[in-house]
Amino acid sequence: MPKVISQKEFNILSRTKERVNFQIVYTKQRNGLHKAAKEYFFKDKDFTIIEDTPDTPDQPDGPCITKGPKEPGGPEEPNGPDKPEDPKDPDTPDVSEGPKEQGGQKDPGGPDDPSEGKQKVSKPDKYVTHRELDEKLKDFATKADFKRVEDKVDVLFELQKTQGEQIKVQGEQIKAQGKQIEQLTETVKVQGEQIRAQGEQIKAQSEEIKEIKVEQKAQGEQIKELQVEQKAQGKTLQLILKTLEKMNERLEKLESK
């Protein structure tokens, strides 16, 4: 389906895109006139453009024009050398001739070689009425459609702008959070050094405790030895006491005699 655009958009597209070919399309009206429109084909475009031209009388056969079947009761179309030329839109550039080469010569397709330079336009299957054309044009994009698209683009642009501001604010927040993380990292590093120093102190204290335990163990062994000696001395004292008691008894016996 060709895409319908405005004359202004067509002129802009003609300046920015390379035009490849065009053909004239006619639609039969009830008053015997044809509605002529030029269908342009552009390079690197996935659609064609129909540019409306003013109403023209019935057109006979020509290189780029095909004559359709006559409607019953309609006037006969002239068929002869005196063919009226197609009316041209003043804003529409003439694309029937290609760009001139160096030296002022035209591309092939001039009067010396009429069989070259133009692509043959296929004959339309049938002519359509105004109503049928309007039904088909409903599928084409209109100025209102372009306006809606422009509005959507404006909304998307504003949305992207707002999102860009939000991303900028979030970037500042992330940057501030990064600084906080760096400060926390330094604090954790200092605390780690302190914990490491405390660990060294605890390790030294543990070594001291081990040495004290060893000394306590040695003192315990000495205490045990002293207890054994005290026990032995106690037994010796008991023997001495018993000996003294026996000696006292003997003395008493001797005195009584």
Swiss-Prot record:
Residue segments, region Disordered: 49-132
Domain of life: Bacteria
Gene3D superfamilies hit by this protein: 6.10.250.40
Pfam families: DUF16
Biased composition (Basic and acidic residues): 80-104, 115-132
Family named by the database record: Belongs to the UPF0134 family.
Protein known as: UPF0134 protein MPN_013
